[in-house]
Amino acid sequence: MEAASSSLDSFFLDVSLIYLYAVVSDRKGNIMLQKLYVFFMKETVLSIAVILALLSMFWVRPDKDYFTYIDFRTLGLLFCLMAIVAGLKAVGVFDILAKKLLMGTSGTVGVIRLLVLLCFFLSMVITNDVALITFVPLALIIVHKLPKELGNYWLLKIVAMQTIAANLGSMLTPIGNPQNLYLYAKAGMSAAELITLMLPYSATALILLLIWIQVAAAKAPHVCGSEKDKTLLGFSDRKELNMEYLAAYLILFTICLLTVARIIPYQIPLVLVLIYMLLRNRENISRVDYSLLATFIALFIFIGNLGRIPQFSSFLERILAGRETLTAVLASQIMSNVPAALLLSGFTDNYRALIVGTNIGGLGTLIASMASLISFKYIAKENRNLRGKYLGIFTASNIIFMIFMLILYFFLR
């Protein structure tokens, strides 16, 4: 009887242990799924790029040719530029520059105009996403200094204006955005050629932005005493510039520009930036957008593998032939303009058309340019209830600008 009882106890103990193991495993599985979901939502483009790269490996097994897919020059330059700009931002260069410019500006409309133009012009040098990371929070601070009615009027409009300004300003230079940097290197163009190609679009965009600001200002509610209103109080007091860091990053930036101009090889700035950060400014290493670099690598693998699948390669080449710009515009609406540039460049050598198409393609949907998501996140953080209204203003404005850019494209072709 005791043996039977002991056997029964042992049975229930085994069942309990199995159940406990199943529960723990299930919980671990759920935690893992939750982590994957959070990562996917946070890094959607990277996640999709990795999935596509892995799927393509079923058709083209990994081999030594995979290394030929990677454009190490573009990756090296992108890393250097992100590290240098992050360093300059951490030093406080952009805050000080903006403060000095705003000190010479009077009136609400003047301040709004300056905040938009800062995004437009500085995006040409510090990239569109860094311009938005720097100046959208500043715009939100300043808007909150305005009388409530006036602040509510400008809040969503100025962020939409800044986003469009950063995307359209960045298209003028090779270092303004990642797709320009990649396609410029791929095409073997000179900086002057790219600037000449995109100048009509940037000039038109600037005129449209200034008109938009004036039209919006004319419709703004008139509130007494709504001028500058101590706007500069939004700036936190910063310690003095670290001149060593400033000088070092400016020298490194100059070396990067020489690399962009193909005067020196990319390995030189890459080694110098790494040595300087490791020896003098290690915390800056964490400020680099490694997810963007990983996205590039995954897409290089995906595109390289597609190029080795004859059926797909010939199909995409037929679709692109003579329609490179419009295809790039449409592809950007779905997958964003950087992945579109990487994908389509593997199946055509008409890089000039892709440069125009992916830059115009940065307008339109919220994901057409990943930089646009930065502004959206700031609005969501400001007030989640404003997301829908902002999306409406942003999308309508983007479509209007895209129509003008496409009209200009058909006129110039």
Predicted regions and their residues:
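Intrinsically disordered, low-complexity non-transmembrane regions of multi-pass membrane transporters
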Residues: 21, 25-46, 52-55, 217-251
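Juxtamembrane and boundary regions of transmembrane helices in multi-pass small-molecule transporters
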Residues: 33, 192-238, 373-413
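Transmembrane helical segments that form the transport core of multi-pass membrane transport proteins
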Residues: 69, 91, 95-98, 251-349
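Membrane-interfacial loop-to-helix junctions in multi-pass transporters
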Residues: 72-74, 103-116, 146-158, 243-247, ...
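Membrane-interface alpha-helices at helix entry/exit sites of multi-pass transporters
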Residues: 109-114, 148-161, 191-198, 351-359, ...
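Hydrophobic transmembrane alpha-helices that form the pore/transport pathway of multi-pass ion
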Residues: 121-171, 182, 342-355, 384, ...
